[in-house]
Amino acid sequence: MKNLKFKRLVLVSDTTKSANQFKFQERFNLITGKNNSIGKSSLVKNIFWALGCEPEFDETWNSLDCKVLLEFTVDTKNYTVLRVHNSITFSDDGEKFYKFGKITGDFSKVFSEIVNFKARLPSRGDDPVLETPPPAYYFLPFYIDQLRSWTSPWNSFKNLAQYARWKQPIVKYHTGYLSPEHFKIEENIFEYEAEKKEANEEVKKINTAIEIVEKYIPKSNLAITTEDFEVITNEVKEELGNLAEQQEILLSNLSDVQSLKYHLENQLEIAIRAVKEIEEDYQFSVEYIENDDLECPLCGTVHDNSLASRASILSDKQQAEDQVLFIQQEINTLDTTIDELQPQLEKARHRIAEINNKYDKSNNNNKKYNLTEIVDSFASQSVQRNVEETKIEKQALHKNRSDKQKELKKEQRELLTKDRKQGLGDFFTGLITEFVGKLNAKGVNLSKVKHPMDYNKLFGSGGAAEGTRAALAYQMTVFRQIYYSNNEIPAPLVIDTPNQQEQAIQNYERIIELILEDTPNQSQVILCGMDNQYLGPYKDKANIICLDEHKLLKKNGYDKLSNELSLITESAKEGYNNAINLDS
């Protein structure tokens, strides 16, 4: 089975003219030191930051403004990634480098292909599209963050709330309940949803057009035979000419323009509302928040509130204001068109009325016909008939797409067979029960923990130290289930300081034993912990990175490492290039 493994991490701070590099071996790695404030957590956070995740750094580290390079492998293939702020430079051969201006979009797609991560999430907004989520959603089950994860699994990184309701599909994908085929079908469902929405918008426009026709030409109860109309037409055809056709065209054009104006006015209301909301966001960030972090009161996500972030808000506001201005200009153009069409329509109708006065008469059956009414009726019926046909067509399309969506959702449900679901459930409950027992966390009530989505039910029973061990049992179970499910290429398991809540000596020994004996043989493990005698069995098998009082960055070595990163940056080609090989 293929695995992703970290090889080398390089940190460079031009601010302090200091740098360092760290190498990892394929199986066990230990990051340790004599005390708790030497940078163990910052080191592992930078691994994930380099790959586009957003771990929570303290202000001291942020002030260093580091560039971070990471070398990693998937099976036998080497990859290099360099992150500077939010820009990613990437290579799959160590020679040709390609620069991505942002983490979302192309880079996320490239990375997801490398690790075979097929989960997709709908974007927020009125017109959601199915997107490849950033690498953070892939790495979530592989990183136990010291501050965020021991009491809240699936919460190792910031900014995860960029997608609504992401947890269920992501957790289920990692643990095998949703397959890559599920998301392939989901893409088709979203395509049909977009077609349904477009059809609905067309129906709304058609209804508006019909209302406009009825406004200009009220409904008539006039009934006239073809023979009667031919008699009248023959008498007046030289003078009536193309007036009926002209009125029909003018009326159709006017209804189209009025309908478009109506919908643009709705869009204008939305755009104005967006400007106001963005202005309120900026005022709040400036007037009420004193630091560079802002925690969401609803989901707990910590958002960036730095000067750069505030500048981004102002940029968003400018874009929204530009959109308001553009829509207003479009409406003004439509108003001009309406002002031009209305006199033309009135002129045509006035000419028809003149002909009506000239030829108003009764036929031999004493039936009296008003030519204006006849021409109006035929024009109105023609326009309404055309739009009604389109309306019926769009409604049929909407129903067809809804039916296809139902078929696809049924196909999705059938992907997870009863036996497969039972097998996944048995694997999960059996393993977490075994691990909780091995970790001596028997005070934790597992009776309601039947599924990987039940992680919150781990907490609340047993003591705080037992809760920490139960959290590790859960994370280890998920890690093993990822291998069992085989939906993706697994990443290394990174555990930041498992000695939470002052674990008793024998329980800490059990934690180390579980990590050594119950992680898959082909997996890579990176463990952070204070140096002590109980780490002995792990140290015997591990590559040890021992941090000293100089912490992560040193003055010596800066020139060499800085030059290495500069050469990569200078050689990188701007933008995504299809030359990147994703098939190896």
Where are these regions (language model features)?
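Extended, charged alpha-helical "arm/stalk" segments used for dimerization and assembly
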Residues: 86-183, 187-190
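Short coil/loop "hinge" linkers that interrupt or connect long alpha-helical coiled-coils or helical hairpins
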Residues: 282-316, 450, 454-459
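Conserved ABC ATPase signature
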Residues: 34-39, 448, 452-475, 498-506
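Alpha-helical coiled-coil
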Residues: 102-143, 246-294
